[in-house]
From Swiss-Prot:
Name this polypeptide is given: UPF0178 protein lwe1471
Organism: Listeria welshimeri serovar 6b (strain ATCC 35897 / DSM 20650 / CCUG 15529 / CIP 8149 / NCTC 11857 / SLCC 5334 / V8)
Domain of life: Bacteria
One Pfam family matching this protein: DUF188
Record InterPro entries: UPF0178
HAMAP family tied to this protein: UPF0178 (MF_00489)
Assigned protein family: Belongs to the UPF0178 family.
Amino acid sequence: MEYVPKILVDADACPVKAEIKQVAEQFQLEVIFVASFNHYSVNTNGENWIFVDTGKESADMRMMNIANKGDIIVTQDIGLASILLAKGTYVFSNRGELYREEEMSLMLDIRYRHAKERQQGKYSKGPKAMSDQDRSLFKDRITTFLQNK
């Protein structure tokens, strides 16, 4: 029997949950949202949510434990992305960029340098707010990926 991938979402700060649900429904894929108890809600609308301790990296650890080769991951966390890519998953950013293993070293280095700059008091702007166009682009990219898989 062929493995049917699931979509795992690093849900604490994910701005495209609605788009993920739409794509999952279209392709009949299971979605699992993983978030800390800080984001707990009794109103999950029948969705599959896993809530974890509020400790640093708790959601990441849970995602690493339940991810399987071939699963689709949505996260902004480059460190988590690099680990899950090594497990044979497909990792997308919240903006629909498909991370590639050969890019991870450079991306992790840039993240490290930015963290050092922040420690020195140099603050950079955060990411721009998600627009409707960004949401549409995310949905288009993940849909195209699944159609070609």
